[in-house]
Amino acid sequence: MTANVNVLVLPTHMRENDSAAIIIPSTRSAPQKEVSYKHLVAITDSLHRDLAHLGITKACKVAIVLPNGLEFVAVFLSVLRQRAVAAPLDAQLTESEFKDIFSRMKPELVIMLPIPPESSGGPCLPAPAMRAALGLTLRVALCRRTSDVKDGSGLGLQLALDLLEPAHSNHPAVAIVPKASAYSRDDVWSEDGALMLFTSGTTGAPKSVVLSHINLLVAMRIIIANHQLSSMDRTIIITPLHHIIGVCGSLLVTLFSGACAVIPDSLPGAFWQYCTEFGVTWFHAVPTLHRLLLKFPRTKDSMPPRLRFLRSGGSEMAPDLYETLKAFGVPVLEVYGMTETGPAIFCNHLDENGAGARQRSHYPIPDAVDVMILVSSDQPEGETYDKTSLQADQYSNLKMTKEPGVIGEVCVRGKNVMAGYINNSRANTEAFLPNGYFRTGDLGTIQSSGQLKLVGRLKEVINKGGIKIGPSEVEHAALSHESVSEAVCFRIADVMYGEEIGLAVKLRSNSGKNQCTDRDLKQHIRYQLSAFKVPKEIVFVDAVHYNRTGKPLRTQVSQKFAEGLL
């Protein structure tokens, strides 16, 4: 192992950098704040010492329950500086959800904002987390703003441990932990655990993932190179920083390319005005958020002048949305990655003249990532085992290939991939092949051009009489109908074919069911797809539900249909 190489600690030269690192736009109750790199390093150093004072040391798990903002950025960087593992959590979770997560991860410290006085009218977001933490006798530190760090702005941050008693007297008191030594920058190792996250759970129960400094840096360097990020860039972060694409794929790639991140406390209605005002050059959003942003007012119905590209990830972008965004003349880039592999390791890049070189669901394969396609050696092309049913003695029936055009499960290997799920040997056996490749659960193929093309999720692909049908292509065909607002394709049981195609559709608000029947929609889809891919059942719904990264909950819809709940 090598110390002080490839670590997520801001470089020493940043101590003298007066350029803006973070901008927090003004709100009704607070003025705009601009924090330079010099100031950010000073704040991080101060918080780093506070963490040591609180007994946080190497490999300690620190739960960060903070909304998007300066506090999150400074606390996150300081946790990594002290060789601890940062575990950002959604501040909007319920007390029950916090208890479940805290019980599994057993954090040495939980960091949150002070609860505002009732008279302030401010949101009490941390309250459920605080109740859950104290109920489990966990230590809680409140991140308060002070004026201890001064570089002209008078804004500083300092942590204070709030020694509150547990909610019930029959619980033991919160333990007092001795102080720890503050690590120097040279003490931080690239193999140290840096980030703990929980998987989205669309294909099963959420699992705990820890990524090291080097895991994250490999992914970050791919993004920085492919998007040609530099100190001249500015991004506006509207994705949650407790998601990997937010904290690593947006925030860290910005800071470690010397650029500036604009971080509003919530999605602003004047989003496009913010982009123009702050000189935003790029931003990331899931497809559903891109659709929402298109409804926000824009000056002369055009894009902000400094915008270099738009980026999308989390789920596949529908053709109609891509064409709408593309019409504004700004490159639209898609990215693909997982919590387990690091974010956006497969990402569209900008060519030399700045135009986006892309095809929908096609991604260049970076040199740092080895990709193979897993298929069955004794079954038809594209047939692959379900991870959860795979037994060790079945590996002899599988083969890996890079042959162009062969469809199978996408498997990856590289320094970006996690070491394994935490305390979950069964999940690791299912996820990793004996040769070290990680099974993504996504179906895809390597094209003759060398690009990776995604087909769909292994557990969501519909096997209709032995023919594999990706749900996204059916959804895209439905979305091209003028009356359709949202659509989710799902599998249904069928006596003849084993599985058939179901489609749940939400109509546009200005369109009634009388204007679009299931027969109309089937005919529309038939014009675009082969008859074999036309849904057998179409149901009209009031809402289509997505997970927190914008992926439609196809398995959930399938279950509800089977139970007669749609």
Swiss-Prot record:
List the Pfam families.
Answer: AMP-binding, AMP-binding_C
| GO molecular function terms listed in the Swiss-Prot or TrEMBL record | ATP binding; medium-chain fatty acid-CoA ligase activity
**What Gene3D superfamilies does its record include?**
3.30.300.30, N-terminal domain of ligase-like
Q: This chain belongs to which protein, by name? A: Acyl-CoA synthetase ALT10
Q: Does the keyword Mitochondrion apply?
A: no
| Extra facts | Gene clusters encoding host-selective toxins (HSTs) are localized on conditionally dispensable chromosomes (CDCs), also called supernumerary chromosomes, where they are present in multiple copies. The CDCs are not essential for saprophytic growth but controls host-selective pathogenicity.
Q: Give the family, as the similarity comment puts it.
A: Belongs to the ATP-dependent AMP-binding enzyme family.
EC number(s) in its UniProt entry? Answer: 6.2.1.-
Protein purpose: Acyl-CoA synthetase; part of the gene cluster that mediates the biosynthesis of the host-selective toxins (HSTs) AAL-toxins, sphinganine-analog mycotoxins responsible for Alternaria stem canker on tomato by the tomato pathotype. ALT1 also selectively transfers methyl groups at the first and the third cycle of chain elongation for AAL toxin.
Name its pathway: Mycotoxin biosynthesis
Q: Which PANTHER family match?
A: ACYL-COA SYNTHETASE, MEDIUM-CHAIN ACYL-COA LIGASE ACSF2, MITOCHONDRIAL
User: What InterPro entries has UniProt attached to this entry?
Assistant: AMP-bd_C (IPR025110), AMP-bd_C_sf (IPR045851), AMP-binding_CS (IPR020845), AMP-dep_synth/lig_dom (IPR000873), ANL_N_sf (IPR042099)
What residues does AMP bind to?
196-207
- Give the gene name: ALT10
**A biological-process GO annotation:** fatty acid metabolic process
Q: What organism is listed for this UniProt entry?
A: Alternaria alternata
Q: Keyword annotations for this protein? A: ATP-binding, Ligase, Nucleotide-binding
Q: Does the keyword Nucleotide-binding apply?
A: yes
Region feature AMP-binding, mapped onto this chain: 473-551
